Amino acid sequence: MSPPRPESEAELKKIEKNERRRKSYKAKREASSYQKIKDEIPEIPGWLMSNQLGKQLEASDKFTMLVEKGEISVIDEVINQGGVPVLVEFLATGDTAELRLIAAQSLANIARGNLVQTQVIIDQNGIPPLVYRLGTGNDEIREMAICALSNISYHSTHTREAVIDSGAFLELWKLLKQPFEPRLTILTKASLALANFCRGEPPNKTVFNQIRQNMPVLKQLLLMTDKQVATNACTTFSLIASKADMIQAVDEAQICARMIELIKKPMPECFEPALLTLAEIAAQNHVSAQAVISAGLVFALVNSTRAESDFRKDAAQAILNITNNGSPEQILSLVNDGCIPPLCALLTCADPMTVCICLNGLRNILRADQARKGMVEECGGMEKIAVLQHNENTDARDIAVEILEGFWPEKIDWDHYLN
């Protein structure tokens, strides 16, 4: 039976007033509780290092909450009071699983801080016991160890190499090669760690060689239905696709359709890495370009015109790469799919690099088939290009003038240039 409806406007106002009071009280109570925990920051390191499991568990929970809310000062408290070597010892030789879990979680939290704070873990030889816990112990400890190693590797090439050189990647790779055996939360953390191992310059040869030799493993992660795992795999593909010795393996993995699918869902987290990957594949050769076209690249471009500027630029770059390297038939296919209207629409965006990419794409299309002038005019592209000949950005201005000279010379403002 549904609850009775308010009988009068006065009753409705009273209900709304009480709801506002309830929310206000809840917010004040949460703020008061949080402030109390902040006041305990100087005590948390001592509780973590005590011999009382209850205190250690409480301190670990509070430590995690404070770090998640950006209270990085608590990390300095733990470091300054000598907590890191104690936590490393707990992780390596702790008597109970609870104690080892507390240690792994605390080290993961410290690695969420800055590079200087993370370096303390490395200096205190904290990486080896974290790697050891990847292959032993319960799933919760393994998950926290993965988090810690992932966080450490994210900070710099130096910290990444320290993690990989310790054997972390090979242990992690074992988990990823059997994606249906670990629980999903472990797979989520492991796929994120893999992406972090692929960041930075120069790339780590061991990681890239293993991925290249076992590309189906990464593709399997990309095909998974879990949103976060797929996003992490998509990010990894974007990081390796930009490398000359990896792009062929990425191309041969035949992932274009899946990348477009992730964009269509839509999954905003995947927009940028998916488009970056497609742009790299499209730049390879005619066969690769056709795979990207057939997957529905123009849809991604049209969809991106309503997205953030970075996404629009990446989608336009993929189109440009095909117009640079594709056959006349492939360029015609892009046109028939409807690429001209979104390219013209993006000529007025605020980002000059995106504008230049779109201008170059339109120039290539017109060079391939001058008969497409009418389509550009219908979309307002000609007028926008004419306006761009006065743009403050030198590159955009020069490309616009070149297009006008070749296809609409009557639109060039000669008085402006002669004066």
Where in the sequence are the language-model features?
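Alpha-helical solenoid scaffolds in large eukaryotic transport, assembly, and signaling factors
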Residues: 17-37, 46, 50-89, 97, ...
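Alpha-helical scaffold repeats of the Armadillo/HEAT/TPR superfamily
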Residues: 40, 78-86, 121-129, 163-172, ...
